[in-house]
Amino acid sequence: LSLYAFLLEEEDELADRYLQTVKGYIDFYSRLLGPYPYEKFALVENSRQTGYGMPSFTLMGSRIIRFPFILHSSYPHEILHNWWGNGVFPDLGQGNWSEGLTAYLADHLLLELKGKGAQYRFQEMMKFSNYVNKENDFPLSAFGYRDSMASQAIGYAKLLMVFHMLRTEVGDENFLKSLKRF
């Protein structure tokens, strides 16, 4: 597996931090879900403040990648999109389930491993409670991409909770076996 960091300006220390971190997350998720689906991974810095997971790379903003907490929050989320969203592609006509599953296995799971899973789920339920109401709620099958706090609460938080309920119902072993087969 070839790893790259394409930065707007040469910053060896920053590049090294991202390259070391991505190796650990790709190893972790490969053990959890199956082999990494591409021959390379690249962090690509851009001037817009984005965080997009693309097939075999992630496009992240120049200010964003310099926040130290990003290495263990948004970055693993974008790495995981190589499995969900850019490895197994959702049929957007049926709903973009990949954001909820990626949030569940990156944002949530990494905190759960530190004993903070329930706290994270509560925080996500509060987002749903605060931003979604009868007028702006919609079924998960209608979620494409986030374009508001309400759509984020539905497509990420609500769907994350669906995956948590599924895992709770079938158990860890069956849940992970199913993801590996998928």
Which ranges hold each PLM region?
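Juxtacatalytic substrate-recognition/specificity segment
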Residues: 1-82, 86-97, 105, 109, ...
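Short, compositionally biased low-complexity segments
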Residues: 1-4, 136, 169-177
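Alpha-helical packing segments of well-folded alpha/beta enzyme cores
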Residues: 21-26, 79, 159-162, 166, ...
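Surface-exposed acidic, glycine-flexible loop patches that form ligand/cofactor-binding
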Residues: 31-35, 166-173
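Acidic/polar loop patches that form or flank catalytic/metal-binding clefts of enzymes
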Residues: 35-41, 90-92, 113-122, 173-178
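General structural signal for alpha-helix termini and helix-helix connectors
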Residues: 85, 89, 165-168, 181
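Acidic/His/Gly-enriched intrinsically disordered linker/tail segments
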Residues: 93-95, 99-161, 165, 169-170
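Short alpha-helical scaffolding segments that buttress acidic/His motifs in well-ordered protein cores
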Residues: 105, 178-182
